């Protein structure tokens, strides 16, 4: 077990080498704040029986959630696509998130929200029309990023994208993602970068960006990949700061020949990939475009940044 983080929570190492903090003590369940250890959800909840629900992860830096509006919009879209009743308006979601973060001491943390279709008395593939959604949320400290990750980059593998056909929905049904991440770990890598029919989609738990000839390229939005909020931030920052960027399909050959590859995620910002399937990416070191984007992304974590 590693040292405690600033919240006093024990830090443990996952099999991928990442640090993971234990959840903070208070959670939200169906409109109430209560100790996480006292939270109870029915075993007949559809998220447990069917994976019938959606989730969202909101990064909070020093009490500030820079992508809050994008997170709430994506949550609402996922609920709408699954025809799960959205129990709150956007402002109510924002207040719930702020209240939960503040109740756990604020600072640098993430809020995990999960909304299931709800609990029925029985197991029915077709849900009953009057089922009430279950809303659950907890917090945990943001995992610290080891300095060597930024200095040396990540090693990744490529893998066949075996996820379902609606990856644009942030569904709690993540078995394929779990198996793909496990495949990467078993190969001694940090993450699996996914290919479908010879084209780049996502990584198992991140969005993927490549740099070719100084231009950032990210696969276009479709049902085959999640509309990542940090990916959206990268697009906005590139446009605002004159960094060449395009939403363009990336072939396997282009991926393997890229000058730079990065991963982006809410809890880590942007991180460089320096080895892919055992081969160096570019010159095998984090690249200059990534270094500039990292600085811009991390500046955005401060209000007014």
Feature-to-residue mapping (PLM):
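Helix-start/capping segments and mature chain N-termini
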Residues: 2-99, 121, 125-305
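Ordered, amphipathic secondary-structure segments that act as subunit-interaction surfaces
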Residues: 106-115
């Amino acid at each position: 077990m590693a040292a405690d983080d600033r919240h006093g929570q024990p830090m443990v190492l996952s099999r991928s080498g990442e640090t993971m903090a234990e959840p903070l003590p208070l959670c939200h369940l169906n409109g109430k704040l209560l100790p996480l250890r006292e939270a109870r959800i029915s075993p007949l909840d559809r998220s447990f029986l069917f994976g019938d629900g959606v989730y969202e992860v909101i990064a909070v830096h020093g009490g500030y959630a820079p992508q809050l509006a994008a997170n709430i919009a994506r949550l609402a879209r996922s609920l709408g696509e699954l025809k799960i009743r959205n129990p709150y308006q956007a402002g109510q979601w924002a207040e719930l998130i702020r209240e939960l973060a503040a109740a756990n001491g604020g600072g640098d943390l993430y809020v995990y929200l999960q909304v299931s279709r709800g609990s029925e008395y029985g197991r029915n593939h077709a849900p009953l029309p009057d089922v009430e959604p279950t809303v659950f949320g907890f917090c945990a400290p943001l995992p610290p990023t080891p300095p060597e990750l930024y200095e040396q980059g990540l090693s990744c593998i490529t893998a066949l994208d075996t996820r379902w056909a609606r990856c644009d929905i942030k569904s709690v049904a993540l078995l394929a993602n779990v198996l793909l991440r496990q495949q990467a770990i078993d190969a001694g890598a940090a993450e699996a970068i996914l290919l479908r029919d010879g084209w780049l989609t996502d990584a198992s738990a991140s969005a993927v960006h490549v740099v070719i000839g100084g231009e950032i390229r990210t696969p276009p939005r479709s049902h085959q990949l999640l509309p990542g909020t940090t990916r959206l931030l990268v697009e906005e920052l590139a446009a605002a700061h004159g960094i060449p960027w395009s939403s363009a399909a990336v072939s396997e050959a282009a991926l393997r020949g890229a000058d730079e590859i990065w991963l982006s995620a809410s809890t880590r910002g942007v991180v460089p990939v320096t080895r892919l399937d055992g081969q160096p990416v570019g010159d095998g070191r984090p690249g200059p475009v990534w270094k500039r984007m990292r600085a811009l992304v991390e500046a955005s974590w401060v209000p007014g940044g």
